[in-house]
């Protein structure tokens, strides 16, 4: 943020995105490619490969949620950095509940430091995640500082 000599505040848009999966299911071992972008400031999230690329070094907040496919007993998803390491080793675990006949959903938030050029993606590590136009499976994030 800068202030001009005329007193105007110039605050460039911070990197931010909010994306969903509009159709299809994603099975274990695959990156979830969120193909619908409701917000993509700076176009740092790719709807073709499912990765967010940090444009600058800083602290980022990420959130993601998913609906488990009803045909799978357990589903797990994790946030990965640079195609390999899990961030904070946190995961979403979605289990069947005996009282419902449809998939279960859950969400989480993660804050982490990234360097410029680092990538972040959401990967299914067990089971199958459901995607639909209802936006049950989503991912988003933004630069905090």
Residue ranges and their predicted role:
Residues 5-145:
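Extracellular jelly-roll beta-sandwich "head" domains, especially the C-terminal globular C1q domain
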